[in-house]
């Protein structure tokens, strides 16, 4: 089954707007490994980023990876490195890369002893992150994994949603981020990054 199939009601609009004839393409993780070699420079070996501002792709849901690449390819999401890279990806490439990264494991990181995890945990409960991101915040379908993601990257994304400068397919994250203070963003990102 293609990872671009069954993306869900919230993502349907982007597919109708960006790729009206997205064919069903079987995903090939082995082919994805070959195609992912260029990704290693930023996202790290096997999609495990060592750069705190660059997301780890290991263990992300395949539909999420394919959807993000599609949004970069179609100009809905913009980034100086990702937009040119995605511009020439075929639907087969999107699926293969997505299958490869979804199959990788994100290793456990040492917890930051200076982090106030109680505030972050409270905010995650208060904002009901599990409703969309899954019970253990590992992501599902076209919604990303948050657990174990790079702290600085998470902060940047939350700030972008709050400022409405980050593309938000359905407006859920923009709404959720509005009441967050900078201290809340830091605490929430620290908590999520430290999850195993």
Model-assigned labels for residue ranges:
Residues 87-109, 152, 157, 176-196:
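C-terminal capping alpha-helices of c-type cytochrome domains
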């Amino acid at each position: 089954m293609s990872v671009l199939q069954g993306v869900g009601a919230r993502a349907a609009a982007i597919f109708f707007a960006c790729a009206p004839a997205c064919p069903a393409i079987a995903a090939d993780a082995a082919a994805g490994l070959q195609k992912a070699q260029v990704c290693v420079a930023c996202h790290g070996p096997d999609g495990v980023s060592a750069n705190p501002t660059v997301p780890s792709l290991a263990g992300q849901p395949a539909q999420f990876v394919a959807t993000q690449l599609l949004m970069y390819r179609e100009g809905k999401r913009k980034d100086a490195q990702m937009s040119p890279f995605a511009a020439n990806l075929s639907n087969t490439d999107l699926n293969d890369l997505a299958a490869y990264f979804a199959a990788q494991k994100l290793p456990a990181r040492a917890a930051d002893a200076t982090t106030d995890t109680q505030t972050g945990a409270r905010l995650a409960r208060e904002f009901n992150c599990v409703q969309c991101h899954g019970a253990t915040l590992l992501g599902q379908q076209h919604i990303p994994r948050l657990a174990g993601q790079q702290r600085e990257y998470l902060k940047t994304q939350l700030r972008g949603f709050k400022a409405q400068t980050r593309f938000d397919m359905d407006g859920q994250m923009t709404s959720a981020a509005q009441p967050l203070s900078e201290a809340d963003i830091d605490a929430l990102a620290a908590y999520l990054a430290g999850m195993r």
